[in-house]
Amino acid sequence: MNRRRERVVVVGAGLAGSLVALYLARQGHEVDVFERRPDPRSALGRPEGRSINLGLSARGMRALDGVGLLADVLKHSVPMRDRVVHSPDGGIRTQPYGVREHEILHSVLREELISLVVTAAEAEPGVRFHFDSLLASLDRETGTVDVAPTAGGETRTVTADLIVGADGAFSTIRQQMQHGLRANYAQEFLPWGYKELTIPVDADGQPRVRLEALHVWPGHEAMMIAHPNRDGSLTCTLFMAHEGPVSFAALDTPTAVRDFFRQRFPDAEELMPDLVREVTEHPVGHLVTVRSDPWRYADRVVLIGDAAHAVYPFYGQGMNSAFEDCVVLDECLTAHPDRATALAAYEAARKPHTDVLADLSTANFEDLRDRVHRLGYSASAAADRLLARLLPQHWVPLYGMVAHTTIPYADALARAKRQDRILRQAGAGLALVTVLAATAALRAGRRRRANRR
């Protein structure tokens, strides 16, 4: 973007919109952010049972670090070092997230993170947030938007040099920007939805399960994931079909709720004293993947985050990839004085990789649902980690590349496929020898460290 002070309108004050406002303000621009919902820092902006906790990983951490927010955000997070898998028979299996000490995730409440980013952006000179403000229309040719109070009132027209659509998976900016263009758009709803539940602290104020981990209750017809919170509680997300014999619709009585949990998640049912009320009262959310192009129009309009590429939450990369959009857009606007060139470079740099992320997120849903509790899955993941320890410069598991590096998603998948081909070509025998050698080397290393103590 040119170095002169320009006016930017951001539509959407969620995670991506708030962070991109901060990045653009740091470039010296005047930024107005319009959001149809109330201020997320207010009680009205925090409805109960409507969010999935966030797993902050390397891409999101890099974006927050770029504006000096990472340290503050980490203070509001809980480290997740492992995935703890709960079986219906009561068995528990632990799967580390990485092979090195720093390769962990950080659990943070969505509303806390949004509040931190909004407050930081609002403190920048020239940044103004307009909550309870509904986008009425976009004129892509003139770079204007019409906005009106959600409670009713006078519509006003705002003109900007650049309009950023950060208004979510069902983006109005995207719809109006692409209207009449040779645009591609695909939307796919998962037959499953989600509902937020809680594992509170016990009577002594202590966590009921191990806190520094993501807890997973897999299942082919229903599964549950629990993120830790700083107060010792866990926020659970129950995933299952909207309709059918095993579905949210079928959990229509207290008895049905209790029987369902006792059969499928028996150890979890004991940890959730408010289970029946939460299942009965909390809303069911929808899960959608969105692919579209173009992401920009001329030098005036651009999409980021879910407005450009919504994905299922099962790889934990929705927020991280949206934050990465902010970094790449900032870099492209800095590198290219011509804004149209910058926006084209941004889309070219991001879209191939977010398309791959959509595929990875769908595949990880199937893993979490059907395979994560199987011994073969655990053995394969363990072999991957052992090879990474033995050959750190040459072997990186796919999950590690996605979560613990900023390697572009498509590049990470291509490298993982090459690694898989190597194992297949080497044959099962050589792979077993390699894993056994890696195990022996690791054990020897542990003995040496113990002797030094």
Curated annotation (Swiss-Prot):
This is Kynurenine 3-monooxygenase. Its EC number is 1.14.13.9. Pathway: Cofactor biosynthesis; NAD(+) biosynthesis; quinolinate from L-kynurenine: step 1/3. PANTHER family: KYNURENINE 3-MONOOXYGENASE. One of its GO terms (biological process) is L-tryptophan catabolic process. Belongs to the aromatic-ring hydroxylase family. KMO subfamily. The keyword Membrane does not apply. One of its GO terms (molecular function) is FAD binding. Its cofactor is FAD. Keywords: FAD, Flavoprotein, Monooxygenase, NADP, Oxidoreductase, Pyridine nucleotide biosynthesis. The keyword Flavoprotein applies. Gene3D superfamilies: FAD/NAD(P)-binding domain (3.50.50.60). It catalyses: L-kynurenine + NADPH + O2 + H(+) = 3-hydroxy-L-kynurenine + NADP(+) + H2O. Signal peptide: none annotated. It is an enzyme of class 1 (oxidoreductase). Catalyzes the hydroxylation of L-kynurenine (L-Kyn) to form 3-hydroxy-L-kynurenine (L-3OHKyn). Required for synthesis of quinolinic acid.
